[in-house]
């Protein structure tokens, strides 16, 4: 009984940490990544489509993203979508491809980004702790319904706390890695 509750908790906590990693991919560091353009939608035959579904995205240099649309007529549409996204960079095209050169981040902007990263990490830790609370509540209900003994409950609570500590440490690790990436000049 307790194993299922703990396994379910681990799965939910892992999803929280994965969600943080995905959010961090969208945060601009000094380096170019195609993840910066993940949220951009382009009008394609009347439907808003993700940029990655209408063009090939690549990072040929550390501060440059190239976008190669599958149809040349999409170039102005893609440029407009990038400009409307307010990401802080301007696309340039040569008729076949669109190049985005990322300007270097200022020290002030880097510190703002780190502050945002820390808030995102803290929100994830809160989510992990809420999952712990729900797990412990489930275990207490099992004990109340006499499906597990009081000793089993205490052992399971300790295991739940250990699992929670592990996932909080993972969040810290992800934050530290991204922080280093942002502060790297």
UniProtKB/Swiss-Prot annotation:
Pfam families, per database record: RRF
Keyword set, alphabetical order: Cytoplasm, Protein biosynthesis
CDD domains: RRF
Protein localization: Cytoplasm
Chief location of this protein within or outside the cell: cytoplasm
Gene Ontology MF annotations: ribosomal large subunit binding
GO CC aspect terms: cytosol
Keyword Protein biosynthesis: yes
GO biological process, alphabetically ordered: cytoplasmic translational termination
InterPro entries on file: Ribosome_recyc_fac, Ribosome_recyc_fac_dom, RRF_sf
Family: Belongs to the RRF family.
NCBIfam families hit by this protein: frr (TIGR00496)
Known function: Responsible for the release of ribosomes from messenger RNA at the termination of protein biosynthesis. May increase the efficiency of translation by recycling ribosomes from one round of translation to another.
HAMAP family attached to this UniProt entry: RRF
Name of the protein in its database record: Ribosome-recycling factor
Species in which this protein is naturally found: Geobacter metallireducens (strain ATCC 53774 / DSM 7210 / GS-15)
Gene name linked to the record: frr
